[in-house]
Amino acid sequence: MKDIIYSLIENEKMYPEQIAIKHNTDVLTYRELNQYANKLADLIKDTKSPLIVYGHMSPFMIVGMIASMKAGCGYVPLDISMPEERINTIIEKINPDFIFNTSEHSLDSNGREIVNTETLLTDNRTVEFESKIKDQDIAYTIFTSGSTGEPKGVQIRYESLNEFTNWMVDLNKIGENQQWLNQAPFSFDLSVMAIYPCLATAGTLNLVDKTMINKPKLLNDMLEQSKINVWVSTPSFMEMCLMLPNLAETHYESLKEFFFCGEILPHKTAKMLLQRFPSAYIYNTYGPTEATVAVTSILITEAVINQYNPLPVGKARPGTQLSLAENEELIISGQCVSEGYVKDEQRSNEVFKDIDKRKSYFTGDKATVQDDLWFITGRIDFQVKLNGYRMELEEIEFHLRQIDVVKEAIVVPVYKNNKVTQLQGVVVLNDLNDDKDEQTVIHDIKQELKQAMPEYMIPRKIIFKEQFPLTINGKLDRKQIAEDVLA
């Protein structure tokens, strides 16, 4: 089994001048990555609290991650796009001794020691540092949104990270020394899917920043220059990129493998991608942050596309057990499961339990099994009750997306006095209806919905949008869409 820190030491010996991480013109070789990590680990070696790693897509953020694991304290990644109040809440909860600031933004240190990249660049020592991290130590803590408004810090052990990385290395069909693309900010655990499998196989990690996401031409230039082999992103980010007409195998011959996680992979998106890249390996994966990124996978083939709609998320990875509670809630058990939420025993006890002496996580996701494959069918908390009828918003969204003229869809419940009074369907259209007026298109959409679902589930209003906003993590921003509609 590959050990991440050991793999990096081996890579430094075998490929010292190979580029490990690249962001625009900023690059770090494997030698530089290891040496800077040793210097930072030496600086923080006596701390018992996690290292805050702050910035946006700087290669030095990964230096901070590796250094923190070598020092045995682990890290908490924070992106500069996060609101200041949220950052301060997280820092207060973690109470770190050190903050590694890789950006030009200033942070309120509140008496804590701030280390910046300049500190490492001007340190002329040669430092040999023997890694202190043990399997049971926390490798990283990633904060996710909490239903109470206070973010939850998900703690992942080093052994869980190594197990996940080895599974990804086994899934990867195209071997070592590849060019990987990472779309997700480091504060989102999808980035873990790119960082460690790439570095464990002596690849080069190419980082996509906010500017590239907002200007597809810059992304196109990066894809062409870096000759990307492995793509890791949310499905929503891929949907946006498929608007680039030359995103196809004929133009990007090097692009051979895709990994998707973080959201449901829509059937239409997968079908279009497979048409554009017929010889590529396309993986649909599923997993919550609380279970170390992803716990299932399936290779999307033409046969899978033809047989299943919606698409399955596949089979559980080795060492992980999946089961269903009575209400169809998916339960994940195994070494992948988080240690719990940092300094939050109450919320940890609500969702982390021992089943047959195995640590288990109650996901809040509804699931089903068909043909030995797992399907995610919605969220327990996406159920609403309208006029006495209980319904799944995601089921309505699924049927909206099956309509030819609909490219993407979100269903927004409208509340009055804490009660749902109506549903509104918000859709982005394909370019198939130029000759029809808005009311005709709305009528056609509702007529098609009537073929698939009861009248009471059909949204009262259909609202058109040019495009949907994405969160900083590259997912559909449901909250922003709802606020825009209800404003």
Swiss-Prot record:
Subcellular location: Cytoplasm
Binding site for D-alanine: 189, 293, 475
Catalysed reactions, semicolon-separated: holo-[D-alanyl-carrier protein] + D-alanine + ATP = D-alanyl-[D-alanyl-carrier protein] + AMP + diphosphate
Residues given in the record as ATP binding sites: 144-145, 284-289, 365, 475
InterPro entries: AA_adenyl_dom, AMP-bd_C, AMP-bd_C_sf, AMP-dep_synth/lig_dom, ANL_N_sf, DltA, DltA-like
Pfam family, one: AMP-binding
GO biological process: one example: lipoteichoic acid biosynthetic process
GO molecular function terms noted in the UniProt entry: ATP binding; D-alanine [D-alanyl carrier protein] ligase activity
Pathway: Cell wall biogenesis; lipoteichoic acid biosynthesis
Keyword Nucleotide-binding on entry: yes
EC number: 6.2.1.54
Zinc-finger in keyword set: no
Record function comment: Catalyzes the first step in the D-alanylation of lipoteichoic acid (LTA), the activation of D-alanine and its transfer onto the D-alanyl carrier protein (Dcp) DltC. In an ATP-dependent two-step reaction, forms a high energy D-alanyl-AMP intermediate, followed by transfer of the D-alanyl residue as a thiol ester to the phosphopantheinyl prosthetic group of the Dcp. D-alanylation of LTA plays an important role in modulating the properties of the cell wall in Gram-positive bacteria, influencing the net charge of the cell wall.
Listed NCBIfam families: AA-adenyl-dom, D-ala-DACP-lig, PRK04813.1
Protein name: D-alanine--D-alanyl carrier protein ligase
